[in-house]
Amino acid sequence: MTERAGLRLHDTAAGAVRDFVPLREGHVSIYLCGATVQGLPHIGHVRSGVAFDILRRWLMARGFDVAFIRNVTDIDDKILNKAAAAERPWWEWAATYERAFTAAYDALDVLPPSAEPRATGHVTQMVELIERLIERGHAYAGGGDVYFDVLSYPDYGQLSGHKVDDVHQGEGVATGKRDQRDFTLWKGAKPGEPSWPTPWGRGRPGWHLECSAMARTYLGAQFDIHCGGMDLIFPHHENEIAQSRAAGDGFARYWLHNGWVTMGGEKMSKSLGNVLAIPTMLQRVRPAELRYYLGSAHYRSILEFSDIALQDAVNAYVGVEEFLHRVRSRVGAVVVGDWTPRFAAALDDDLSVPIALAEIHHIRAEGNRALDAGDHDAALQSASSIRALMGILGCDPLDERWESRDETSAALAAVDVLVQAELENRQKAREERNWALADEIRNRLKNAGIEVTDTADGPQWLLGGDGK
């Protein structure tokens, strides 16, 4: 099958499913809003990575060349505040958690992006974008900051459906703003914060500006698809559109948004304290099982986390895995086959993964019946098809990469038991004000390549790679 098979995607801007037609035949350009690296990645973060990794894999299977950009926001109020509270340099804090996100994506076999730009590496492009906006009458300097004039852009609110009169940027009152509906492009320097020189004085970029500048740098003035979580529709993506198009760029042609992961009906977020960190989850289930779970619901739906739902996904994945192992042990090697028309139709219909999974489990049932009846050819054909389908979803159980990840996950679980014991000893030493012993334990862990960060939720550890 070819790229002209009729892929349709739900475009948030249109509020409907649309035929996908790329700007350039055979090529697709995608920008995914990546992490603000302020803390450990949780399953809400990584669901976005998995959802749009499936999109990328399907496009590649269809024969497209895919340019996939995922940024890193490494300068932000939350990063600065948390680093200051921990008495650590902001750049060290950001780098620590950037590595944690990379490790989480790698563990779940999310394909590496074509490029992964950091915000701090693209300040020059951000300043150039601001200059264009000021020249066109869409931005102004005030009080040391630079703001986007929302009323200067008549189409503001079309993505989110917000009426201009009802806009609240959530930035608080700023003395330099002409209108409180305007949003910040550039923040004037504050004592103790990182800053860069500009024509308007030293400062640092606003969050919305970062993505517009990086998307343009790597994908050009117009590109195919912009992805992100549904919580980014407003104000982040609305503001990206406004500043990019006001500067004369076509920007994204399709907008795709994935649903939240919730617990008890509430969005999973650090501020609510209801997060499930990826390292914690990988002590409970294997990486492939977690990926299967996060990708199993339709990407636009809310994924309500529960232990029962997680176990159901694990059981479903194990059922597929056991079938493939049965075929391999009885018949022989199982090569990757072709995808089926029903599977292709499901993914072409706005990435309907639940229907695609139903096809996989239907084939598995047929394959098990064939194997029990001694029809090895039919069983092998079923197994080969399943490998192809599960591979497009990124969780083929017979892929050798998963076997190595399973071993790594088991090793990390064993290390965690040992590290937690050391952290308990360190906490006891701190309670007894035995600072020398507490420092000795921390240094011992550091020499083993384990970074310990004290947070409001207790100490967290990461493999830092700096062991002697």
Curated annotation (Swiss-Prot):
Main localization, broad class: cytoplasm
What Pfam families would the database entry show?
Answer: DALR_2, tRNA-synt_1e
Question: Where do we find the motif 'HIGH' region here?
Answer: 35-45
Cofactor section:
Zn(2+)
Q: Where in the cell is it found?
A: Cytoplasm
Instruction: Note the SUPFAM superfamilies from the entry.
Output: Anticodon-binding domain of a subclass of class I aminoacyl-tRNA synthetases, Nucleotidylyl transferase
Tell me which residues bind Zn(2+).
Answer: C33, C211, H236, E240
Principal EC category = ligase
Report the catalytic activity: tRNA(Cys) + L-cysteine + ATP = L-cysteinyl-tRNA(Cys) + AMP + diphosphate
- Where does the record locate the signal sequence feature? none
Query: Tell me, what is one Gene Ontology molecular-function annotation carried by this entry?
Result: ATP binding
Return the EC number: 6.1.1.16
Q: Which SMART domains match?
A: DALR_2
Q: Which GO terms describe its biological process?
A: cysteinyl-tRNA aminoacylation
Residues engaged in binding ATP: K270
Q: Which domain of life, per UniProt?
A: Bacteria
InterPro entries attached here?
Answer: Cys-tRNA-ligase, Cys-tRNA-synt_Ia_DALR, Cys-tRNA/MSH_ligase, Rossmann-like_a/b/a_fold, tRNA-synt_1_cat_dom, tRNAsynth_Ia_anticodon-bd
Whether ATP-binding counts among this entry's keywords is: yes
Q: Where is this motif: 'KMSKS' region?
A: 267-271
Question: Per the annotation, how and in what number is the cofactor bound?
Answer: Binds 1 zinc ion per subunit.
Q: Which UniProt keywords apply?
A: Aminoacyl-tRNA synthetase, ATP-binding, Cytoplasm, Ligase, Metal-binding, Nucleotide-binding, Protein biosynthesis, Zinc
Q: One GO cellular component term, please give it.
A: cytosol
Q: Which family does it belong to?
A: Belongs to the class-I aminoacyl-tRNA synthetase family.
Quaternary organization:
Monomer.
What this protein is called in its record is Cysteine--tRNA ligase
Organism expressing this protein natively: Mycobacterium ulcerans (strain Agy99)
* Lineage summary: Bacteria, Bacillati, Actinomycetota, Actinomycetes, Mycobacteriales
